[in-house]
Amino acid sequence: MRILLSNDDGYLAPGLAALYEALRPLAEILVMAPEQNCSGASNSLTLSRPLSVSRSAATGFYYVNGTPTDSVHVALTGMLDTKPDLVVSGINNGQNMGDDTLYSGTVAAATEGIMFGVPAIAFSLVHKEWAHLGDAARVAAEIVRHYLDHPLPGQPLLNINIPNLPYEELKGWRVTRLGKRHPSQPVIRQTNPRGEPIYWIGAAGDALDASEGTDFHATASGYVSITPLQLDLTHTQMLAATRDWARAGSGAS
């Protein structure tokens, strides 16, 4: 078994190291991660310049001067002779639930695996600062082991969020849907030394839909949330109405 491991917090992140150590007994692990923290990079690819790959003398981890998606893309198309059995991303320093998944570099690294037909799992720790990281890595390894022993059909993309709790206090796993956030807080305006305005993106909004069945509800209740995602963004319920709208606008009968 071979696992390609990546993240969006960078190759020096504690979450990556903890997950690597937890997965080592399960498979051969190749690590390819971004050189820098790329939180919020989403699925961006670097197309305006060439990419360089380096290897850490301390850990043996490979890293690229690009995005999480670059990392997985380069590994799958330029380094590995055969596909890995699984792409794993994480453990992220903070949750990736609800609308977070659209911006998440952690989820994006996993998504790139799916683009090339490789099953993928993204792991995130719900709160920042790495509290109970070792326990989260233990849970992640259990989930990966279960997947390797009992694979899901097709090429699943699983988004997994782990509460910051001691292992003994976690209540188990729950399969969930994505919740929904309120819009983000407004940007924070400041002034640079030249007197010019600069802007910081505001904090994420609070949970809007945290009802039972959502990832927000599960993790707040002490459960590990497992949300299956898909790449097809088609709004199928809108197809008929959109056809009627387009037909009316084009003058077609």
Swiss-Prot record:
It is an enzyme of class 3 (hydrolase). GO terms for cellular component: cytoplasm. It is found in: Cytoplasm. It catalyses: a ribonucleoside 5'-phosphate + H2O = a ribonucleoside + phosphate. Belongs to the SurE nucleotidase family. Nucleotidase that shows phosphatase activity on nucleoside 5'-monophosphates. This is 5'-nucleotidase SurE. The lineage of its organism: Bacteria, Pseudomonadati, Pseudomonadota, Betaproteobacteria, Burkholderiales.
